[in-house]
Each structure stands twice: as structure tokens, then as C-alpha cells.
Amino acid sequence: MKIGIIAGSTRQGRNSAGVAHWVAQGVAGREGVESVLLDLATFELPMFDAPMPPMMLNRKYESDAVKAWSQAVDDCDGFIFVLPEYNRSVPAVLKNAIDWLAPEWMDKTAACVGYGSANGIRAVEHCRSILTNFTRHVIRPQVALSIFTDISDGAVVPSERLQGDLKNMVDGLVAVIARRQA
């Protein structure tokens, strides 16, 4: 089973890379489960401007960056979206990355880790709404991080509560993916 951990911000000084690293540690060591970091900063996706919706493109993308993104997403069985809350929503770069693809997301399972001044709750709910267009299941357990108390210098300050939330979320994600693959 392969879980893609999507670092959903490309902003300078962002926290998503550090949070994604912490999430990867929470996935590590599980038998039969591997994780891969899908850092949107490394894909350099153009703004969505395809001549037709992705579902109609049949994976025939013109941009090499989109082709690489498509392959990376297609290779995963499920995802953990690590996203900050920007103006009560998801970052534009993450929405753009989601919008570029369609069949690659279909029938896969997702989970969300949000962070922000209000713990990223609104961004997670918006992300769930977006993902339900494609995914079979966006699991309910999530991790909510405060940028004031749970993150310092771009890294998660682990606590017993956060470690428990992460374990609960990853356990749920792995269980749903395993049932789907059975």
C-alpha cells in the first residue's frame, strides 16, 4: 500500500514541508505500508488552463509537470493532504493541483491534516468537499494543528494528543484502503 503525503503549500517560509515530514513519521514502520512525499513546490504545475475538463482529457496532458504529477498521484493508493488554512479555504496551489487531474483521484481514499490560526478546520472541511467529487472516501479522523502552539520553526511540536490524533487518522486511512484492496 502506498500513501502519498501531499504538502499543500508552496509559500516561502511555509510549514507544510515540516508538517508533512511529521506525518510521514507517523506512517513509517507499518508493515506493508510505504509513504511518498508529494511536495507541490517540486512539481511547478502551471495554472489550470486545459482546453477541456481533466476527465475528458483521458490522461493526455501537454505539460511535462502535469504528466509527472499525474503519474505520482496515480501511483498512490491513498493520500494524506497536509494543508494550511488560507482565508478560510485551501491554498490556491493545492486546488490547482487537484483540478489538473480527475481519473487519477477516482476511488481513492484520503485524510487531511490541517493547520492555521484556527487549526485549519475550515480548510479541511473545504478540502473534503472538493475531494468527495473524486474519492471514494475522505475519512473523518483528522489532525488539527495550531500555528501558535503546535508548530515551531516549521516543525510540529509533538504532544500526546497530537500523536494520538495522527495515529488514529493513519490507522483509519490504512484500514479503509486495505478493505478496498481486499
Predicted regions and their residues:
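Short, functionally important structural connectors and interaction interfaces within domains
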Residues: 2, 30, 40, 97, ...
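Helix-loop-strand module that forms the ligand-binding subsite of alpha/beta enzymes
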Residues: 57-135
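N-terminal beta1-alpha1-beta2 submodule of the flavodoxin-like/Rossmannoid cofactor-binding fold
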Residues: 1-83, 89-93, 156-182
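FMN-binding flavodoxin-like domain, especially the glycine-rich phosphate-binding loop
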Residues: 106-182
